[in-house]
């Protein structure tokens, strides 16, 4: 069985209890797939507090590859795979530029998105968003 959470985890409260529930719902060979924004990405670092994927107050939690791996481990999961979502950087960068009310937000966002995409090619853990595949510990 599989549970998928596409840009959901950052909205959930209470977080620890949710992870415990997810673990209890999965069978021994169950898989949890979660996609979340990566606050250690190139675009997050470039924009700082203005990064649109912080999305306060809707995003209650912000994850790095290390923090989500530790969270999963704390609740009985092993990180099996990690995949970048490099194209999220284009949308997030354009939205950030728009929210900052800067001139030419589309063009500026595309430039930053392109730079972020190249950074993610070299260092996948710097992708704007990441997909994590967790398996239950045995």
Region spans (language model):
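Generic structural signal for short, flexible, solvent-exposed coil/loop and linker residues
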Residues: 36, 49-57, 121-123
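A C-terminal cap/extension of S-adenosyl-L-methionine-dependent methyltransferases
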Residues: 81-138
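Conserved SAM-binding loop
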Residues: 1-47, 60-75, 87, 129-137
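N-terminal start-of-chain detector that recognizes signal peptides
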Residues: 6, 33-34, 52, 102-108
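Residue-level detector of anion-binding/catalytic polar loops
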Residues: 78
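Generic, low-specificity signal for short hydrophobic/alpha-helical stretches with a mild N-terminal bias
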Residues: 4, 50-54, 112, 116
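Short glycine/proline- and charge-enriched loop/turn segments
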Residues: 47-56, 95-102
């Amino acid at each position: 069985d599989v549970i998928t959470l596409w840009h959901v985890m950052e909205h959930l409260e209470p977080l620890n209890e949710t992870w415990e529930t997810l673990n209890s719902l999965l069978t021994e060979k169950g898989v949890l797939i979660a996609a979340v924004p990566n606050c250690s990405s190139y675009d997050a670092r470039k924009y700082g507090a203005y990064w649109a994927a912080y999305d306060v107050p809707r995003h209650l939690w912000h994850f790095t590859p290390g923090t989500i791996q530790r969270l999963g481990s704390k609740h009985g999961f092993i990180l099996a795979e990690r995949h970048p979502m490099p194209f999220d950087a284009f949308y997030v960068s354009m939205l950030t530029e728009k929210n900052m009310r800067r001139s030419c937000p589309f063009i500026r966002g595309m430039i930053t998105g392109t730079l972020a995409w190249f950074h993610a090619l070299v260092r996948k853990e710097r992708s704007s968003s990441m997909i994590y595949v967790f398996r239950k510990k045995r």
